[in-house]
Amino acid sequence: MLTDIALDAWGSDKAPEPEIKGAILACRHLPVRVHLVGQQDVLEPLLAQALRGARLPIEIVHASERIAMDEKAAQAVRTKRDSSMRVGLKLVREKKVAGFFTAGNTGAAMATAKMVLGALPGVDRPALALAVPTLTGPTILLDVGANTDCKAHNLEQFAVMGEMYARKVLKVDRPRVGILSVGEEEGKGNDLTREAFPLIKALPLNFIGNVEGRDIYNGHCDVIVCDGFVGNVALKTSEGILKLVREMLKISLKSTVTAQVGALLSRRAFDEFKRRLDPSEYGGTPLLGVRGVCIIGHGSSNDRAIMNGIRVAAEFATAGVNQQLEADFAAPADSHA
């Protein structure tokens, strides 16, 4: 049985080529049907050329407008009523597809999802949840940018949503949940983290207390909650460090003949290193807390990242994360498990 996923054809920086190629990859390797949302007269010949006569479960859904990366989110969402984002998310709302993926303007995607889908009952603020690669498997960090100012009960809700993500999608048994702070002791941190600590501690989760920045990457915690300001700074810092490490490795491995020979002998290990840290392998970041599956990818997404974004959307839909979250937030607090 195929899972129907809507794909924003006008999302990425180089759209629609990565989206078309990514849709084809997804349909060849995953049990999905892709609804490519964008200008039909532009997409039809490009899709036909890319398919080269192959028959795959891809269909085009017309949307006459595109939201550009540099557009102001609020204005674009308000004025572009037939944007590919809005049309794709309407398909989710109308249950014509199980999920939506875009590599477009993040602010516009979040605003459109909140407007078209709405928040789950009981959820005050949806959050962006990033799967961070570690030695032992992904760690979920949320929020990474949807809410720069938060209250303690927002972090409490992030903990519930992140734990559900880790348990249902990543198949982690009893995920360890922590609060990102400046020290491990209960009294450490700012007003926000100190107020959130007893709220999360009272939940029936596997709460391990405060964690520090290094714990994002060491695999000692499965779900780390923070406000969107701190989370986004951590995300952008990580991206910068990763780029630095890659460039330093390239320079070092070309510095001498001995280093070049060593690089050739270690090529398989370096390829595995690159694969594990490659953002395209992780596809996209789910917007947790809206009434439908919405996955947001990076603007630089290539065809493989698009395919993996479609995969993540299908996994979320199949796992029933939103249905479980809706049931959890509608139930008494002691039933969150």
UniProtKB/Swiss-Prot annotation:
GO terms under biological process: fatty acid biosynthetic process; phospholipid biosynthetic process
Cell compartment(s), UniProt: Cytoplasm
SUPFAM superfamilies to which the protein is assigned, alphabetical: Isocitrate/Isopropylmalate dehydrogenase-like
Pathway: Lipid metabolism; phospholipid metabolism
EC number: 2.3.1.274
GO function terms (MF aspect): phosphate:acyl-[acyl carrier protein] acyltransferase activity
TM ranges: none
Keywords: Cytoplasm, Lipid biosynthesis, Lipid metabolism, Phospholipid biosynthesis, Phospholipid metabolism, Transferase
Record's signal peptide: none
Enzyme class: transferase
Reaction(s) the record says it catalyses: a fatty acyl-[ACP] + phosphate = an acyl phosphate + holo-[ACP]
Matches recorded under PANTHER family: FATTY ACID/PHOSPHOLIPID SYNTHESIS PROTEIN PLSX, PHOSPHATE ACYLTRANSFERASE
SUBUNIT field: Homodimer. Probably interacts with PlsY.
Function according to Swiss-Prot or TrEMBL: Catalyzes the reversible formation of acyl-phosphate (acyl-PO(4)) from acyl-[acyl-carrier-protein] (acyl-ACP). This enzyme utilizes acyl-ACP as fatty acyl donor, but not acyl-CoA.
Protein name, per record: Phosphate acyltransferase
Species name: Acidobacterium capsulatum (strain ATCC 51196 / DSM 11244 / BCRC 80197 / JCM 7670 / NBRC 15755 / NCIMB 13165 / 161)
